[in-house]
């Protein structure tokens, strides 16, 4: 009976990290007599090469297990007795592969238990990492929800501020309308006051004229009184003259009578007496007639003058009373208008003060509104960056979890497929390919593996204003600037972009004069020979072929005054 030996393979880890970085490419050779097993892994982002843990374990355990294989032969022969009927057709092949089977199956002993314990520990660590990741994810989701609530609160406050601003504007418009109405009313009152003052002036002139006419009438009255006295004197004189003439006539009559009496002839005496009587009667009638005419004329003229003076005086008194009443009324109205004007002026000053206070309040509200908008935009940018970082980190954790799940499944298949040794090489290659596939999805960090070392890159950026450094190539090929404002263009002409490498070397690029970065747009600046200039979206830094790369790279944007407006810090650490 032919003996068929069964050997076991064990894998142990001697690296500090207990697991090779995912996505690396390692090559290891395992040689046993005339059979060599080659394990190949791919490494997409590494910078060096080394033996994988499987190759190192295979090479180290083959030499140590040869003496032990001889002791385990008898035990393995007993265990493989049940397979004799199944492998009779492989007897010739078994003789040829006996040495290889002894070398390969010698690994499946206590080393398998060590591998199981090692990967069970890694599974526990991976489960803890998954739990911590889920916990962090829940915390981040809580923080995100809290930030969303704060954002909703800020939006509500912004809407309230906007409504208050609209109400203030409506109130200011109403006050302006009231002010314009009051100003129009004040202007109308001023015109009415001017008209009333003109009317008062005219009435004063009319009153002065009436006073002048009254004075003239009084003068005329005095003159007429003097004339009346003069006429009365003339009448008295005439009466006296008449009395004198009467006396003279009486004397003449007496003389004539005397003469007549001397005439002895009765006919003559009678004749002269009759003639004298007739003459006296005629004279008396003529005198009475003249006297009556003069008296009637004087009386009618006097009555007429007195009536005219009385009528004119009554009219002047009436007009003067009317003028006094009108002046009194106008003075009362003027006093009322002046009081109303004072009230309107005080109200106008109060309204102007209120308008000034509302303008100040409006300016404060506008400044608060702009500050709230800027704060909200900065918080939104910060939350977007944090969300992006959380999404990237979450994607990394999910990729790590998928990788660990794939490794666990493959190692479980390897442990369960202990009896079937034909697919060992395919399983190892599947593990390696899985590593390579999962490494390609890692976008946040880049691992460079050489032997047992790895490096990690991280970045941090900040901005004061709307212009930020959106992206900076780690190899220094390009830098991207972004205007985060949705409506405002930014003039960044003659701004300086400095890139400091490891605190030593520094490259400076000055943007063209009068360059404007449009709202919501980006500007990509290439190093020399790394891109084509296409303003305003692309520019070229002609001084260097690269902006520079290193372990600690700081990219800083300065304005024309030398103030720092945006930063982008890249760090690369080695573990």
From Swiss-Prot:
Biased composition (Basic and acidic residues): 63-72
Biased composition (Polar residues): 7-17
GO BP: any one term: protein localization to nuclear envelope
Region Tail, residue ranges: 423-572
Signal peptide coordinates: none
Lineage: Eukaryota, Metazoa, Ecdysozoa, Nematoda, Chromadorea
Family statement: Belongs to the intermediate filament family.
Pfam families: Filament (PF00038), LTD (PF00932)
SUPFAM superfamilies referenced in this protein's UniProt entry, alphabetically: Intermediate filament protein, coiled coil region (SSF64593), Lamin A/C globular tail domain (SSF74853)
UniProt main location, coarse: cytoplasm
Summary of subunit composition and partner proteins: Forms some heteromeric filaments with ifb-1.
Listed GO CC annotations: cytoplasm; intermediate filament; nuclear envelope; nuclear lamina
Function in brief: Cytoplasmic intermediate filaments make up the structural component of the cytoskeleton providing mechanical strength to cells. Essential protein required during embryogenesis especially for survival past the L1 larva stage, involved in intestine morphogenesis.
Expression (tissue specificity): Isoform d is abundantly expressed in the marginal cells of the pharynx, forming apicobasally oriented thick filament bundles that are attached to the apical and basal plasma membrane by hemi-adherens junctions. Expression of isoform c is also seen in the excretory cells and in the uterus. Isoform c is detectable in the amphid sensory neurins and the pharyngeal-intestinal valve. Both isoform c and isoform d are expressed in the rectum and vulva and in some neurons of the tail.
Record-linked InterPro entries: IF_conserved (IPR018039), IF_rod_dom (IPR039008), Intermed_filament_ifa/ifb (IPR016451), Lamin_tail_dom (IPR001322), Lamin_tail_dom_sf (IPR036415)
Region annotation (Coil 1B) ranges: 119-256
Domain IF rod span(s) in chain numbering: 69-422
Any one GO molecular-function label of the UniProt entry: structural constituent of cytoskeleton
Region (Linker 1): 105-118
Region (Disordered): 1-30, 45-72
Name of this chain's protein: Intermediate filament protein ifa-1
Superkingdom classification of source: Eukaryota
Limits of the LTD domain: 455-572
Annotated region described as Coil 1A, given as residue ranges: 73-104
Region of interest (Linker 12), ranges: 257-274
Head: region residues: 1-72
